């Protein structure tokens, strides 16, 4: 098949350089680049993102080249602590892609190759306009799930049906008109659809994304078809091509070697610690790169872990241990490990882990499913609420903490339910079922494998 690849193909890649978005897209690009070594992939991201993603340890293929774009942060700017503040600054600077046109031209001049395809994070909706101007395919990648695409694609329908005024207080209303969802709580729609600052750059970006996606040549989704079949069926009727391609790290592509064994750093010794724990007994706690519970909730979660006697591995960045109850670390020292970072996929795959206490970010939920581990969700923003709804009400593989925030009693109840209550057998059986479906999807000639091959054909310029 490689002989049919366009030898001077040049693919522009426009990530959303925050949270795990850019890393997830780069992982996909690396798979494609290894299978199409004659194709150049130009990866446009912020300096901070590039420094992290293109470190020597990452071993990025030589045909993937980084190009820095401004992050939009004014010199001397003092951040307020809002999770999406740096996102809004970047989006304001990028605008509708005007600032990227010069960088794209520079990459064309440097490589001597005209851009023949634009890949982007789906959030970067204006990439569709750039691709249209160049007369080339646009392939957005949704780092979240198909359910998020549905919510943003139908935003106008939702706003028209529900109304935009007096919406506060209606979070618990159940609606049944959104295609693909049998029902959904209004308060669990992603931020920017009905709730939150709808005039913020972030909310406007999501709304424009929903309107722009129909022009895409194909939409690649970080999921597998069997997880949300009703939603996928509806989306396939609305878009030109839907390609669920996960878990893509396990899929072999033509003309490239099989994926190497996963290498990871365990500098804090998480895995040896887990080796000494009983099967399915440990609560692994991690909230991603952007979400951190407020101090009162960190204290409540700590109190629940101590009172319940649950062994736990807690990945806690920025060292907010000052918020723990006095003496907590010493009293729990025999059954806990608290680290600033953990190799999450490997931790979840360890047999000692019995539950994942999470913010319900999409990658975290997907990794937990792939490992067969039930979840306890404490959603914060973005698609977290929607993912928590799916975990508890649709997939039935976990629970949301009572009231959506950590309290001592509510967290103890959730831990008991998932780890020791009779219901834990049902939760574990359900998540094990989805784990098997995920593994099947990446088998030979199965859904995610076929879709990733199709994506390679489109992006790398096979002569179809």
From Swiss-Prot:
pH dependence of activity: Optimum pH is 8.
Known tissue expression: Mostly expressed in leaves and flowers and, to a lower extent, in roots. In flowers, mainly observed in petals, toruses and scapes, and at lower levels in pistils and stamens.
Protein source organism: Rhododendron delavayi (Rhododendron)
Glycan attachment positions: 38
Keyword Signal attributed: yes
One Pfam family named in its UniProt record: UDPGT
Binding, an anthocyanidin: 19, 21, 152, 382
Protein family according to the UniProt entry: Belongs to the UDP-glycosyltransferase family.
Assembly information from the UniProt record: Monomer.
One of the GO BP terms on file: positive regulation of anthocyanin biosynthetic process
A molecular function GO annotation: quercetin 3-O-glucosyltransferase activity
UniProt temperature dependence: Optimum temperature is 30 degrees Celsius.
Protein name: Anthocyanidin 3-O-galactosyltransferase 3GT1
Pathway annotation from the record: Pigment biosynthesis; anthocyanin biosynthesis
Keyword Glycosyltransferase attached: yes
EC identifiers of the protein: 2.4.1.115, 2.4.1.294
InterPro entries: UDP_glucos_trans, UDP_glycos_trans_CS
Role of this protein: Flavonoid 3-O-glycosyltransferase involved in the biosynthesis of anthocyanins conferring flower red/pink colors, mainly anthocyanidin 3-O-glycosides. Catalyzes the addition of UDP-sugar to the 3-OH of anthocyanidin, with a preference for UDP-galactose (UDP-Gal) as sugar donor and cyanidin as substrate; able to use delphinidin, pelargonidin, peonidin, malvidin and petunidin as substrates in the presence of UDP-Gal. Can also use UDP-glucose (UDP-Glu) as sugar donor with delphinidin, cyanidin and malvidin as substrates, but not active on pelargonidin, peonidin and petunidin.
Keywords of this entry: Flavonoid biosynthesis, Glycoprotein, Glycosyltransferase, Signal, Transferase
Enzyme type, top EC level: transferase
Annotated catalysed reactions: cyanidin + UDP-alpha-D-galactose = cyanidin 3-O-beta-D-galactoside + UDP + H(+); cyanidin + UDP-alpha-D-glucose = cyanidin 3-O-beta-D-glucoside + UDP + H(+); delphinidin + UDP-alpha-D-glucose = delphinidin 3-O-beta-D-glucoside + UDP; malvidin + UDP-alpha-D-glucose = malvidin 3-O-beta-D-glucoside + UDP
Residues annotated as the enzyme's active site: 21, 121
Record-listed UDP-alpha-D-glucose binding positions: 342, 344, 359, 362-364, 367, 383
């Amino acid at each position: 098949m490689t002989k049919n690849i366009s030898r001077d193909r040049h693919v522009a890649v426009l990530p959303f350089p925050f949270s795990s978005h850019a890393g997830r897209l780069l992982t996909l690009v690396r798979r494609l680049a290894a299978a199409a070594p004659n194709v150049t992939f130009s990866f446009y991201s912020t300096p901070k993102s590039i420094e992290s993603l293109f470190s020597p340890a990452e071993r990025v293929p030589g045909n993937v080249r980084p190009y820095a774009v401004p992050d939009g942060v004014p010199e001397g700017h003092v951040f307020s602590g809002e999770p999406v503040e740096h996102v809004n600054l970047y989006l304001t600077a990028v605008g509708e892609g005007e600032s990227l046109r010069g960088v794209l031209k520079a990459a064309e001049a440097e490589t001597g190759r005209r851009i023949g395809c634009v890949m982007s994070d789906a959030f970067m909706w204006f990439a569709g306009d750039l691709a249209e101007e160049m007369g080339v395919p646009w392939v957005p990648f949704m780092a979240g799930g198909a359910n998020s695409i549905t919510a943003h694609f139908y935003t106008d329908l939702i706003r028209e049906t529900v109304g935009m005024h007096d919406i506060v207080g209606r979070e618990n209303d159940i609606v049944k008109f959104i295609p693909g969802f049998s029902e959904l709580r209004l308060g669990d729609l992603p931020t920017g659809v009905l709730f939150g600052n709808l005039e913020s750059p972030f909310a406007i970006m999501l709304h424009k994304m929903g309107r722009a996606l129909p022009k895409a040549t194909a939409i690649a989704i970080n999921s597998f078809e069997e997880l949300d079949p009703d939603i996928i069926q509806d989306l396939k009727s609305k878009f030109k091509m839907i390609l669920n391609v996960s878990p893509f790290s396990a899929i072999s592509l033509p003309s490239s070697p099989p994926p190497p064994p996963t290498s990871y750093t365990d500098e804090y010794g998480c895995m040896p610690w887990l080796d000494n724990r009983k099967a399915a007994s440990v609560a692994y706690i991690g909230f991603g790169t952007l979400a951190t519970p407020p101090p009162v909730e960190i204290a409540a979660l700590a109190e629940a872990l101590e009172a319940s006697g649950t062994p736990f591995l807690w990945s806690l960045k920025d060292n907010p241990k000052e918020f723990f109850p006095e003496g907590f670390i010493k009293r729990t020292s025999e059954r806990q490990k608290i680290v600033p970072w953990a190799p999450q996929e490997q931790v979840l795959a360890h047999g000692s882990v019995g539950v994942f206490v999470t913010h319900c970010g999409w990658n975290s939920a997907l990794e937990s499913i792939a490992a067969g581990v039930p979840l306890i969700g404490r959603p914060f923003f973005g698609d977290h609420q929607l993912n928590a709804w799916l975990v508890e009400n649709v997939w039935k593989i976990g629970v949301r903490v009572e009231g959506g925030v950590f309290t001592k009693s509510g967290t103890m109840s959730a831990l008991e339910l998932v780890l020791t209550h009779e219901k834990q057998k049902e939760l574990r059986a359900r998540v094990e079922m989805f784990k098997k479906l995920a593994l099947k999807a990446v088998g030979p000639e199965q859904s995610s494998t076929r879709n990733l091959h199709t994506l390679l054909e489109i992006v790398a310029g096979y002569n179809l």
